[in-house]
């Protein structure tokens, strides 16, 4: 509990280093009375404990805060179901963190983030080495019944089938040159901003191809063309577009995180 309180205090006050934190715990009356354990904190003990348990403690704090926030914040766009945007971001690491392998002289960890678009807050996180692949983490970030919302880096036809079988829905932008075999063109609403809506098979038979038909919605925004693959046939084309546009919230969050870091 002492380590947990100190770590929360550290991040709330945005200390520049552990040494600055320890100095504050020794000199600040509030910190000495309510944060530091009785008898103070030994530097060597503190750093050893943090190196061994920091991630575990912070993950616990994150999970508890996420539960409380989700229960109090209003839910938006509930008609779309539970939407979870996924993305990855690098975190600088010291060379002694050998598990965070990235480059010979540059260790980085990778934060895989699931962002709850319904409540506008982070939902789930996974930490891997910097070279860790992003697509395999989706099954840890998104639960069955929820919908993954992702960019082109997560396009994987075999995983689309796997997620569908597991009950994990997906709304994923795909590359413009993706081969599509149209099985059925779906009707568009009058004056719809979408220019394409169809049930298709993605990929070619000689390569990686979806076994289960998916839906692809095409639209343009600010002069850029988007193709969105999904298994959500229950939504309108406009709702698929809205769900993908909401994904940009995670990019805003990640950019702010990188600026703070």
Language model features: what each stretch is:
Residues 1-18, 24, 51-53, 60-61, ...:
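Single, function-defining residue in the core of a domain
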Residues 17-35:
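DNA-recognition alpha helix
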Residues 29, 74, 237-238:
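Short hydrophobic/aromatic segments of transmembrane alpha-helices and their interfaces
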Residues 34-35, 71-74, 99-101, 159:
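Catalytic micro-motifs at enzyme active sites that drive phosphoryl/nucleotidyl and oxygen chemistry
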Residues 34-53:
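Major-groove recognition helix of helix-turn-helix-like DNA-binding domains
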Residues 57-69:
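Short Lys/Arg-enriched helix C-cap and helix-to-coil transition segments
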Residues 66-75, 133-135:
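A short, well-structured juxtamembrane/interface segment
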